[in-house]
Design a protein with these regions (language model features):
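Conserved helicase RecA-like core
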Residues: 1-137
């Protein structure tokens, strides 16, 4: 048996290679069409890579913004974005795999307690984050 929360191509290939007649079971609510919750608003901002931090900083200035999580592809980018936003006056913390367990817990604790309202994380490090009142991702 093989269980996976997600089914990226590598997992599908693994199942096809080593399993006989694998069955893909998808857990889904009836009527759920894979769309986001109706209360979620999705917006896309197209910008040049060199302007990303500037655009993010402007978005973070939105009125009524609560806790915000920003995802970065690499550990280096995660640390750089957190540093750049902190230099612009935002209360930020970075969360990535190069941090020790104590530093990761401290960053999450500060985010949960409101001392930091912007958490910049890699997707791997961010798994399992459960924080209330996150308004922007």
């Amino acid at each position: 048996m093989l269980f996976s929360a997600t089914m990226p191509g590598a997992v599908v290939a693994l199942a096809r290679r080593y399993m006989s007649k694998p069955t893909h079971i998808r857990a889904q609510d009836p009527g759920d069409e894979g769309m986001t919750v109706t209360t979620v608003q999705q917006v896309v901002y197209r910008t040049h890579a060199l302007n990303k931090v500037e655009v993010v900083a402007r978005i973070l200035q939105a009125a009524g913004r609560g806790r915000t999580i920003i995802f970065a592809r690499t550990k280096r980018t995660c640390a750089r974005v957190a540093e750049d936003l902190a230099a612009r006056g935002f209360a930020t913390a970075a969360l990535h795999g190069d941090l020790g367990q104590g530093a990761r817990e401290q960053a999450l604790r500060a985010f949960r307690n409101g001392k930091v309202d912007v958490l910049v994380a890699t997707d791997v490090a961010a798994r399992g984050i459960d924080v209330d009142d996150v308004t922007h991702v």
